[in-house]
Amino acid sequence: MEDIIKTLPQHTCSFLKQRFTLYKYQDVWNHQEFLEGRMLSEQTFKAHPNDVFLASYPKSGTTWLKALAFAIITREKFDDSTSPLLTTMPHDCIPLLEKDLEKIQENQRNSLYTPISTHFHYKSLPESARTSNCKIVYIYRNMKDVIVSYYHFLRQIVKLSVEEAPFEEAVDEFCQGISSCGPYWEHILGYWKASLEKPEIFLFLKYEDMKKDPVPSVKKLADFIGHPFTPKEEEAGVIENIIKLCSFEKLSSLEVNKSGMHRPEEAHSIENRLYFRKGKDGDWKNYFTDEMIEKIDKLIDEKLGATGLVLK
């Protein structure tokens, strides 16, 4: 596998001072660990019709979606005072296809069909995931906020200050399609086009709509993944309790998410706090110049205008 990766086109990100390298495989850019996971899943993963995928482009609301899905499916075992989310960060509650293949396969053998998260492009999903009619939840977000969140996440991982990591260079690379799991627009287009062919197995959630009024989206999510709320639960405020438990304010205040590590056993473990920066929409306005805004808006219209998805 490493021998194959060595032969691929590669790009060292200039805004990260060459501390982060991406490899291009089948027209998609990925860092080495995700690429290895993709190749391995292509070879060994077999989807089950009961599997549910939580798909997203990185920094589009993945952490929040995972927390909500986990709280929804485990609410009969735990409430908002006993949930594992109080002591375990969301990424450790829902397995990632790119990194947790053995755990996912073990769950399948034990008939434990918990949601599976992924940042794969639709075309990069193992064939069985695309043909077995698994349900797919796709969360998407304003492209400008994605760029800002992506920029801060990576620069903090490689330990660079804002002054050391030029934001305009990050924007330029992103607009060239060079980003982890990029190009961004191809990621969205793949899932959107697939949803036109099989609308019954897709649920699209918009981050900004969820922030504005989370109740309808949480109800849709619960219905879609097969764990609908009963009228009694709705009257008892269970939906609101789950939303509060999974809120940025709650999760970011927990000790595990302030001082813990994600995958501490690995050489490239990440501080949990890096997954909780601001948790709001519109922060891009503090970073983008008028020229950058014009550039991004033109790109969105050109690449994604036909989808009808509001991404700017």
Swiss-Prot record:
GO-annotated cellular components: cytoplasm
Record's subcellular location: Cytoplasm
Pfam annotation, one family: Sulfotransfer_1
Active site (record annotation): 119
Cystine pairs: none
Signal peptide: none
InterPro entries referenced in this protein's UniProt entry, alphabetically: P-loop_NTPase, Sulfotransferase_dom
SUPFAM superfamilies recorded: P-loop containing nucleoside triphosphate hydrolases (SSF52540)
Keywords, alphabetical: Cytoplasm, Transferase
Residues annotated for 3'-phosphoadenylyl sulfate binding in this entry: 59-64, 141, 149, 207, 277-279
Distribution of this protein across tissues and organs: Highest in shoot tips and lowest in mature leaves and roots.
First-tier enzyme category under EC: transferase
Domain of life: Eukaryota
Record-stated family: Belongs to the sulfotransferase 1 family.
Function: Sulfotransferase that utilizes 3'-phospho-5'-adenylyl sulfate (PAPS) as sulfonate donor to catalyze the sulfate conjugation of quercetin, rhamnetin and isorhamnetin but not kaempferol. O-sulfation of position 3 of flavonol. May play a role in auxin transport.
Protein name: Flavonol 3-sulfotransferase
UniProt organism field: Flaveria bidentis
